[in-house]
UniProtKB/Swiss-Prot annotation:
One of its GO terms (biological process) is sensory perception of sound. It comes from the Eukaryota. Residues 1-2, 65-71, 119-137, 242-292, 357-359, 418-427 are cytoplasmic. GO terms for molecular function: riboflavin transmembrane transporter activity. Plasma membrane transporter mediating the uptake by cells of the water soluble vitamin B2/riboflavin that plays a key role in biochemical oxidation-reduction reactions of the carbohydrate, lipid, and amino acid metabolism. Humans are unable to synthesize vitamin B2/riboflavin and must obtain it via intestinal absorption. Changing N21S: In BVVLS1; loss of localization to cell membrane; loss of riboflavin transport. GO terms for cellular component: apical plasma membrane; cytoplasm; nuclear membrane; nucleus; plasma membrane. Keywords: Cell membrane, Cytoplasm, Deafness, Disease variant, Disulfide bond, Glycoprotein, Membrane, Nucleus, Phosphoprotein, Transmembrane, Transmembrane helix, Transport. Belongs to the riboflavin transporter family. Glycans are attached at N94, N168. It comes from Homo sapiens (Human). It is linked to Brown-Vialetto-Van Laere syndrome 1: A rare neurologic disorder characterized by sensorineural hearing loss and a variety of cranial nerve palsies, which develop over a relatively short period of time in a previously healthy individual. Sensorineural hearing loss may precede the neurological signs. The course is invariably progressive, but the rate of decline is variable within and between families. This is Solute carrier family 52, riboflavin transporter, member 3. Changing C326A: No effect on cell surface localization.
């Protein structure tokens, strides 16, 4: 029974951000098909931030009309909308419309808004729902949330999305007549070498290497259908969770009085969740921990500020510059950093399950350590296309390790802060979700002008780099 509950909670948590994470990992294929090209990530950033209207409305309703807000029907609606939108996405993602003297992916952007609305609102609905379950299930939820990034990345890896190769490109004068390809052709242009060399008065063609994306193993249609299956699994998992006995909704900590012996059970209070039910003491005692939940306003302010800061780094600022910081070291280093940093998220959640530490001092120090790794990643992005140790194996190892440790440290902090707030109240988890979205919004708004307006970062073509020794 316990394994089933952990599995259901994990699948439920996976549905929190699986669709938007899927869009990001599919971008290398989408930018080649849609008219926005490489401006598409900028459009996605704006659309996703506009979707924060969802969590804003939920938070305001909770504050002004708490009695009329129930997260269960909202979650069912979100998961249903997300599943249907993914299915529609699979068939309309490449549909364009003529707007303002040009073709634009209006259907893509509108559907992206609905997917982002689902994922953003999940932060202020999924977490409060988890207050109905014992605390140890919250860690499993964060493991599932980490898998929401890992599973789409693995599907994209199997698809071949984002894989590049170096292609030899030959440039010749416009006056050269259109050649007919023969067996002696250049790799990219199909220009016969014999024909070019035979033309009088012509200079030798110039050749250079460029990065080109490899063809995908299956289309975006299949990818989005797989995303819809993941969302449907999340919907089914939540439905089954609702069908479990009500005794699972009562946290063991809510049933036991800290001031009496472990086997003394206090009477149920009016604000306890669900009717009284039997709880297996052997299971409950194994997860019982000494509470260290801070109650003073200064501690709460520190926790919510740290939640917003950590999510600003992990969701808003650093993802915007990952390609700039890694691609200069080559495609292998980039794919290792991108994949392993995603894997580090659920692994850090698992570590927090077996090695929990609720000390705010420890979490603060770990946040500083993760921020230092993030600072190194940001510095390498600013120095692109010629960062430190470019062309040396040590630089590749450092950038991959830095991204993995950045993701792992801050993921652990996020999980433990959620556990601390869960022990306070359901409202604390809702405000935790609001802080998550606020931090992500501020991070994205800060990076958008730096990347797209001021253009402080320069992209690197690893196949054609000219850096000083």
């Amino acid at each position: 029974m316990a394994f089933l509950m952990h599995l259901l909670v994990c699948v439920f948590g996976m549905g929190s951000w699986v669709t938007i994470n899927g869009l990001w990992v599919e971008l290398p294929l989408l930018v080649m098909e849609l008219p926005e090209g490489w401006y598409l990530p900028s459009y996605l950033t704006v659309v996703i931030q506009l979707a924060n209207i969802g969590p804003l409305l939920v938070t305001l309703l909770h504050h002004f009309r708490p009695s009329c807000l129930s997260e269960v029907p909202i979650i069912f609606t979100l998961l249903g909308v997300g599943t249907v939108t993914c299915i529609i996405f699979a068939f309309l993602w490449n549909m364009t419309s003529w707007v303002l003297d040009g073709h634009h992916s209006i259907a893509f952007l509108v559907l992206t808004f609905f997917l982002a609305l689902v994922d953003c609102t999940s932060s202020v609905t999924f977490l409060p729902f988890m207050s109905r379950l014992p605390t140890y299930y919250l860690t499993t939820f964060f493991v599932g949330e980490g898998l929401s990034g890992l599973l789409p990345a693995l599907v994209a890896l199997a698809q071949g999305s984002g894989l590049t190769t170096c292609v030899n490109v030959t440039e010749i004068s416009d006056s050269v007549p259109s050649p007919v390809p023969t067996r002696e052709t250049d790799i990219a242009q199909g220009v016969p070498r014999a024909l070019v060399s035979a033309l009088p008065g012509m200079e030798a063609p110039l050749s250079h290497l460029e990065s080109r994306y490899l063809p995908a193993h299956f289309s975006p249609l299949v990818f989005f259908l797989l995303l819809s299956i993941m969302m449907a699994c999340c919907l089914v998992a939540f439905f089954v969770l609702q069908r479990q006995p009500r005794c699972w909704e009562a946290s063991v900590e809510d049933l036991l009085n800290d001031q009496v012996t472990l086997h003394s059970i206090r009477p149920r209070e009016e604000n306890d969740l669900g009717p009284a039910g039997t709880v297996d003491s052997s299971q409950g005692q194994g997860y019982l921990e000494e509470k260290a939940a801070p109650c003073c306003p200064a501690h709460l302010a520190f926790i919510y500020t740290l939640v917003a800061f950590v999510n600003a780094l992990t969701n808003g600022m650093l993802p915007s510059v990952q390609t700039y910081s890694c691609l200069s070291y080559g495609p292998v280093a980039y794919h290792l950093a991108a994949t392993l940093s995603i894997v580090a998220n659920p692994l850090a959640s698992l570590v927090s399950m077996f090695l929990p530490n609720r000390s705010l001092l420890f979490l603060g120090v770990l946040s500083v350590l993760g921020t230092c790794f993030g600072g190194y990643n940001m510095a390498m992005a600013v120095m692109s296309p010629c960062p430190l140790l470019q062309g040396h194996w040590g630089g590749e190892v450092l950038i991959v390790a830095s991204w993995v440790l950045f993701s792992g440290c801050l993921s652990y902090v996020k999980v433990m802060l959620g556990v601390v707030l869960r022990d306070l109240s359901r409202s604390a988890l809702l405000w935790c979700g609001a802080a998550v979205q606020l931090g992500s919004l501020l991070g994205a708004l800060l990076m958008f002008p730096l990347v797209n307006v001021l253009r402080l970062f320069s992209s690197a073509d690893f196949c054609n780099l000219h850096c000083p020794a």
